Amino acid sequence: MHKKSSTLIRKREISDVTKESKVVLKSDQQWREQLSEQEYHVCREQGTEPPFSGKLLHNKDSGEYACTCCYAPLFSSVNKYDSGCGWPSFDAPINETAVLYLDDFSHGMKRVEIRCARCDSHLGHVFPDGPKTTGERFCVNSVSLIFNKIETNE
């Protein structure tokens, strides 16, 4: 289970992440060449895709959700649920070091932004209104994720 602080989420430092995985650093130009306009806007400029528009919103296949920018594993289908918010929602990341948490005071609100711990890509936000399993709702832009389906032999 994810450890919580007295506010909402325990903050992680970049140094916590580098012990377990290599941080991906690219120039702005390299990101622009790699990503589509929408991917760049959401992942590198902290944009948001329109609600109910994401390609992964209704995905029910078993597998792993990875970062669009660096392919780091971020979420498991086991933790995905329909929150009704218009974006893919998860009750936890794939592991404790997969995402970074940052205070976000934009748009006159206080929220907690989530980013890929490996490449600092904007993913979305985490809220304290999730299911009973963790109490957290990781609200993630579809465009910031790549889905890797697990093939079953049925």
UniProtKB/Swiss-Prot annotation:
Its EC number is 1.8.4.12. Keywords: Metal-binding, Oxidoreductase, Zinc. GO terms for molecular function: peptide-methionine (R)-S-oxide reductase activity; zinc ion binding. Gene3D superfamilies: Peptide methionine sulfoxide reductase. Residues 28-150 form the MsrB domain. HAMAP family: MsrB. It catalyses: L-methionyl-[protein] + [thioredoxin]-disulfide + H2O = L-methionyl-(R)-S-oxide-[protein] + [thioredoxin]-dithiol. The active site is at C139 (nucleophile). This is Peptide methionine sulfoxide reductase MsrB. Belongs to the MsrB Met sulfoxide reductase family. It holds the Pfam family SelR. SUPFAM superfamilies: Mss4-like. It is an enzyme of class 1 (oxidoreductase). The keyword Oxidoreductase applies. InterPro entries: Met_Sox_Rdtase_MsrB (IPR028427), Met_Sox_Rdtase_MsrB_dom (IPR002579), Mss4-like_sf (IPR011057). Its cofactor is Zn(2+). GO terms for biological process: protein repair; response to oxidative stress. It comes from Vibrio vulnificus (strain YJ016). One of its GO terms (cellular component) is cytoplasm.
